[in-house]
């Protein structure tokens, strides 16, 4: 017997239809009225409170108003902020939706008289050829119904209220029927190829739980040793498991051999077995929440060590170790969020339309990341700024005695919208690495491959920035945004390469506009990742042989200062090479004539990939109201570009130090920022920003811990 299979050609990726939306089949679909589109009123921009603030602080976003250009030793408090009218709430506009007709019945065609039969032997006369009649598509039935409002809300509620619980467990036993319902829910989870690769090992034995607790504690101690001091201090206060406090522990495993060699869906995706078991974990978790049971996922285990300790078959993989029990309460926020360890990322950060990077929530027009970020940047908060200056006057010290630190503490208050401001700890320095085509012009004595070698040095902990970061307790985050060489996958390296180095800007643009925007996006995404991970301060860092040449070109464009006055010696070049470096910058500016009013165009013409990424980091930090401590000349060049894109972004910037490079002095003057440290540093890597970090943290801590005259019972003068 021969079986002939005729397969209809289907699109590779068909989008699921929304309820009530017509879906085209193989035949022409019946036309259905589209929902009427009613424009929704755009919300008015939030009024920006403005108060008159005496030098050295103003409430506008530009730090030129926060940190005055003139050297001010004793800042004066601002005037009382004027109350602003509260805008009336806008009326909610609801779009009317035209409902889809339940069915469409085609009209019947009239019957036609039969044609006369031809006589025998006669040839039929040719007649007009009629077009084939179009057969209308049959009406389709309504889609399968969803849940009613109450049922849908119950499903969504259990998802919203699911929590990873580590505290507040009770010793109440779990009834067998309750545990059975939870396991049945887990067992109904979807699995690739219907392989159902999971097993559930239910542990009640106090002895076994004690053994697992010891294994977890050993891994916790090992992890703590890897953390920078700022993170280690936070981690010490966290409870990571409740193995001994819960009456039931459940181990969820995955069997990668279940279903045999030809399990559907695992031909090219062998990892689908543990992925499927993870779905069973989620089902279990949601069902447990519905039953009033708390669940805590413990991941501090060596997986093979756990398999042996529990006597599991060696071919099984452990997906989850869960602590299950009744709890006193379910917290409104995740415990890690409450502890300041991390923050929930907004949905808008992770939804892309058609292609990665075209961000849009359903119903929105796609927009780029830079546009979204700039729209979220706001000035310093006038109310918190005023409260900071008032508190400074009441603290047990002479007015102005802390100098620049008082200005910084007020800036931090205005940025965070609260006084006292959060202490900017933990902190992370983002070291963006990229190479430069202008290296071919002989502007440095260092070979280009040093960039990649230094990236490896950062990851190995052997660079100066690593030593300084260890001293101040900061994390070092290394991002390959444009290293010319291919870097091996290494723990701690973020591979975000836009292109392998820029082009030589003496012969053409350093990069395209699209590449520039992509590098800016890398910086914004890095800021988002680091802040969502719980960091409260961002520091700029960079690595790229020949990047001071690029910095000089950028600073010359944005300040208008001649390249001869701002181009320094970088890594210590001789007079001949320095003269060549100045000439290279001049030729590039003459070739491109970059317009400072188009900062993205300036970066594309004469910028670097790491400079563009630092621009993104500054903008990203400002949009998240997180302080950004700037390093040296390259960071100064990036800050000039960031200010040109969004002037209010400088409200988040703090000048960590003054570099020995003359271009950095010009940049700081243009930005109106006073540096905290002046040690003739010219290394980069974020080293100057790291040295300044404790000063920034001290400014905030003083606002928290220094008593006022009233609270301390100290008489004022």
Please annotate each region the language model reported.
Residues 43, 93, 101-103, 118, ...:
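N-terminal amphipathic, basic-rich helices that act as targeting or association modules
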Residues 369-717:
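N-terminal loops that bind phosphate or other acidic moieties
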Residues 1-146:
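Long, low-complexity intrinsically disordered regions
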């Amino acid at each position: 017997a021969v079986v002939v299979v005729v397969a209809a050609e289907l699109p590779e990726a068909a989008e699921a239809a929304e309820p009530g939306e017509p879906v085209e089949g193989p035949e022409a679909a019946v036309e259905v009225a589209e929902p009427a589109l009613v424009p929704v009123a755009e919300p008015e921009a939030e009024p920006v409170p403005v108060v008159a603030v005496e030098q050295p602080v103003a409430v506008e976003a530009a730090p030129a108003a926060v940190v005055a250009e003139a050297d001010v030793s004793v800042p004066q408090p601002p005037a009382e902020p004027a109350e602003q009218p509260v805008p009336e709430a806008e009326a909610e506009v609801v779009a009317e939706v035209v409902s889809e007709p339940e069915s469409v019945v085609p009209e019947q065609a009239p019957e036609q008289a039969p044609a006369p039969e031809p006589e025998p032997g006669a040839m039929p006369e040719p007649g007009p050829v009629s077009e084939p009649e179009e057969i209308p598509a049959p009406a389709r039935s309504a889609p399968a119904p969803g849940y009613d409002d109450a049922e849908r809300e119950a499903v969504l509620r259990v998802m919203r209220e699911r929590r990873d619980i580590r505290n507040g467990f009770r010793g109440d036993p779990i009834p067998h029927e309750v545990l059975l319902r939870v396991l049945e829910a887990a067992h109904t989870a979807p699995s690739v190829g219907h392989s159902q690769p999971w097993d559930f090992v239910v542990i009640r034995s106090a002895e076994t739980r004690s053994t697992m607790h010891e294994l977890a504690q050993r891994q916790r101690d090992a992890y703590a040793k890897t953390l920078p001091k700022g993170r280690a201090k936070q981690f010490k206060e966290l409870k990571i498991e409740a193995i001994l406090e819960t009456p039931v522990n459940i181990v969820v495993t995955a069997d990668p051999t279940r279903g045999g060699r030809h399990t559907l869906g695992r031909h090219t995706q062998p990892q689908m077995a543990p992925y499927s078991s993870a779905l069973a974990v989620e089902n279990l978790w949601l069902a447990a929440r519905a039953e009033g049971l708390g669940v805590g996922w413990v991941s501090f285990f060596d997986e093979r060590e756990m398999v042996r300790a529990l006597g599991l078959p060696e071919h099984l993989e452990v997906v989850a170790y869960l602590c299950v029990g009744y709890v006193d309460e379910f917290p409104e926020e995740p415990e890690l969020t409450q502890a300041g360890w991390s923050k929930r990322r907004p949905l808008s950060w992770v939804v892309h339309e058609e292609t990665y990077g075209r961000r849009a929530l359903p119903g929105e027009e796609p927009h780029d990341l830079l546009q979204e970020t700039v729209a979220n940047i706001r000035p310093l908060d006038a109310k918190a700024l005023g409260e900071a200056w008032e508190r400074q006057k009441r603290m047990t010290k002479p007015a102005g005695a802390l100098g620049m630190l008082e200005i910084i503490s007020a800036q931090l208050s205005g940025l965070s919208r609260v006084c006292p401001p959060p202490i900017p700890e933990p902190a992370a320095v983002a070291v963006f690495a990229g190479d430069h085509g202008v290296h071919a012009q002989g502007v440095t004595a260092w070979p280009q491959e040093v960039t990649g070698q230094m990236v490896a040095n950062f990851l190995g902990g052997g660079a100066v920035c690593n030593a300084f970061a260890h001293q101040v307790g900061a994390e070092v985050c290394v991002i390959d945004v444009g290293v010319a060489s291919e870097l091996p996958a290494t723990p701690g390296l973020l591979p975000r390469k836009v292109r392998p180095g820029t082009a030589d800007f003496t012969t053409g643009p350093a990069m395209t506009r699209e590449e520039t925007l992509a590098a800016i996006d890398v910086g914004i995404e890095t800021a988002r990742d680091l802040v969502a991970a719980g960091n409260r301060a961002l520091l700029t860092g960079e690595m790229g042989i020949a990047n001071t040449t690029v910095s000089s070109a950028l600073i010359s464009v944005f300040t208008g200062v001649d390249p001869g006055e701002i181009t320094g010696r970088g890594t210590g070049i001789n007079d001949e090479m320095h003269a060549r470096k100045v000439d290279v910058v001049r030729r590039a500016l003459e070739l491109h004539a970059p317009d400072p009013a188009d900062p993205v165009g300036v970066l594309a013409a004469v910028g670097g990939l790491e400079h563009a990424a630092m621009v993104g980091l500054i903008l990203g930090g400002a949009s998240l109201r997180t302080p950004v401590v700037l390093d040296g000349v390259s960071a100064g060049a990036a800050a000039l570009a960031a200010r040109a894109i969004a002037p209010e972004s400088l409200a988040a910037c703090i000048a960590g130090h003054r570099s020995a490079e003359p271009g950095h002095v010009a940049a700081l003057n243009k930005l109106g920022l006073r540096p905290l440290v002046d040690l003739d540093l010219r290394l980069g890597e974020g080293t100057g920003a790291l040295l300044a970090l404790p000063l920034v943290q001290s400014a905030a801590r003083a606002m928290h811990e220094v008593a006022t005259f009233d609270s301390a019972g100290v008489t004022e003068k």
